[in-house]
Amino acid sequence: MNKPDAQRPRPELPRRILLVLAALLVSLGVLELGLRTWFWGYLFTWPNFVLDARTVLTEGDAGRYVHDDRLGYVPRAGYAAPGLTIEADGRRSTGAQTPGAPILAVGDSFTFGAEVNDPQTWPAQLQKITGRQVLNGGVNGYGFDQIVLRAEALAPIYKPAAIVVAFIADDIRRTEMRRLWGADKPYFDLDKNGLVPRNVPVPPRADPRTTLTFWQRTFGYSLLVDFVLRQLDQLNEWYGDHLRVHPEGTGERIACLLTGRLAELQRSSGARVLMVAEYDPVVWDHPKFAAEQRRMTEGLLACARAHGLAAIDSFDALTAHSAKEGGKPRDLYVRWHMNDAGNRLIAGLVAKALALKAD
């Protein structure tokens, strides 16, 4: 005789879920061991790959930079490596000094000149073009907030005739962060009266062991996770030690208000301020990414002009130069930053905008 529905045995759903999870874990475990057997050396060592990557970055940065209470970090005075010289005052070398009021250049790694030698940076090439001393105050990894603060810190010291503030769109996003690549930084909050500085004095860099998330502490030991993320080109996010304090998009408002501080610096110092937009090389590879980067860039340049600052966008010049030479804009980069030719083009644009002699 058939039993009523209420009396029929129900499937053991929790048990089935546990069996599926157990099978999944066993499968992942087999894949992990198989991958470690393939690479062999990792069969006997089980490092936390995230911690190792962050430790290497921290140790490398300790040699190249020193802590700064206002900016987070600045180049270490006197540091030298093949093709790279940091002067006694913490600026990258641009060559022999020349008399007269200098030009001050501030920015991120594109201004500093990552991936090229001292004479190939655009500040050094600007000095060669104009015959005017150009001070390279660029610093790798800076956000637009740090770039502006750097300009405010250096202008009273060097009393430049002009200040060139260069940026890429990602520098705008960086203003939304409190920590980038393991290093704490100053940032700004927004209130009804404008910008409010936060995280100042900036705390020293934290021990990388203290900033790992639960997932990084747990799955950071997995070679399988590391391998998969490497194939997906997602290791930067997995390894990266970043701390966000503002919702995505807030940086555009912050950066716009920061151009007001640059306008005040222009008034107080008497130095003409020129904003220069450069571009991440990925812009030339992905149209959707390019559209967003250009939108952010054009918005910030519009803010600069509204505050009475001169501003130039290098996008069209990079495109036109490449077409003229029968190449692509990507040819003006090493890997992630401008090469010698790309920096020469930027230097020429700056010289022309400042109404200085250009080749």
Locate each region found by the language model.
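N-terminal Lys/Arg-rich, disordered targeting/topogenic segments
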Residues: 1-13
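Hydrophobic membrane-insertion alpha-helices, especially the h-region
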Residues: 19-34
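Histidine-centered active-site loop/cap adjacent to the catalytic His
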Residues: 30, 330-359
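Generic structural signal for small/hydrophobic residues in well-ordered secondary structure
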Residues: 32, 108, 147, 163, ...
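Membrane/wall-proximal cationic-aromatic binding patches
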Residues: 40-128, 318-333
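Conserved SGNH/GDSL esterase-like catalytic core that processes O-acyl groups on lipids
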Residues: 104, 112-205, 209, 213-214
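Serine-dependent acyl-ester chemistry module
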Residues: 168-301, 309, 314-324
